A protein has these predicted regions:
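Membrane-anchoring hydrophobic helices of lipid-metabolizing enzymes
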Residues: 1-121, 126, 156-160
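Soluble catalytic domains of membrane acyltransferases
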Residues: 90-244
Length: 244
């Protein structure tokens, strides 16, 4: 990594910390709104906005331009809400008025079976609450994540995630050879797996997705077959007033 890139990463992270500091006098509701609107504005200027439009047209061919724009704008705003909520993730999880849980009876059934499972979800709403929630409900869980190129942000996000865990039995591991080893060891030691499975991958099995050839990871399916693990979907949505 060049010195220029390292300095750029440091400045990006420093700018983020300054923005969070400047938002301190405002309420969490107002701060979250400011960050989300900023994300939407900046997102529209990025190359990813056009990529999102093209993808939406493939997935939702019957929607008009206005409807597609609304979906994308909401997505950018959700990312902004997520980033801000990450700054107080531990407190967010303790706020019973902010998070509504449905399907606890399913978790109780899994507990009674006393056998590890694979929880899977996608990057929707605030996906960061999933692993700490499982951990708080006595599910020892290992989660795989993709590291961020900016190591200052990567270290910060990792700390926020681990600080939100109630026990030392759950863990986060970066995608790669190390994570494969740690996840397998976790399963052998009766720990569950949590995965977000909606990201495009440069490696893996080629599948047909909305008429397009894409690659996706299927390693977790091989683990599920080998160890006879159940696959448990988790749905996470953002409600009005940023409740989850």
């Amino acid at each position: 990594m060049t010195l220029f890139i390292s300095i750029r990463y440091l400045l990006e992270f420093f700018l983020f910390k300054i923005i969070i500091f400047l938002l301190f006098p405002f309420s969490k509701k107002m701060s979250s709104k400011i960050i989300s609107k900023s994300f939407m504005f900046l997102g529209k200027l990025s190359k990813y906005n056009q990529i999102a439009k093209n993808n939406c047209k493939i997935v939702f061919p019957d929607l008009n331009e206005k409807e597609i724009t609304k979906i994308i704008n909401n997505s950018w705003q959700n990312l902004g809400h997520n980033l801000f909520e990450l700054t107080f993730l531990k407190k967010l999880l303790k706020d019973k008025h902010k998070i509504e849980i449905k399907g606890l009876e399913v978790l109780e059934k899994i507990k009674k079976e006393n056998f590890p499972v694979i929880f899977f979800s996608i990057h929707s709403s605030n996906w960061e609450v999933c692993v700490p929630f499982l951990d708080q409900n006595n599910f020892k869980t290992g989660a795989i994540y993709r590291h961020i190129n900016n190591f200052f942000f990567n270290r910060y996000i990792y700390k926020q995630r681990t600080d939100a865990l109630k026990t030392n039995d759950s863990f986060y591991t970066p995608k790669g050879k190390v994570s494969a080893k740690e996840i397998l060891e976790g399963v052998i030691n009766s720990k569950n797996i949590f995965l977000l499975v909606d990201q495009k991958d440069s490696a893996g099995t080629e599948v047909n997705f909305f008429g397009k050839k894409v690659k996706t990871q299927t390693g977790f399916l091989k683990i599920a077959r080998k160890y006879k693990l159940k696959l448990i979907p988790m749905k996470n949505i953002r409600l009005p007033n940023n409740k989850l």
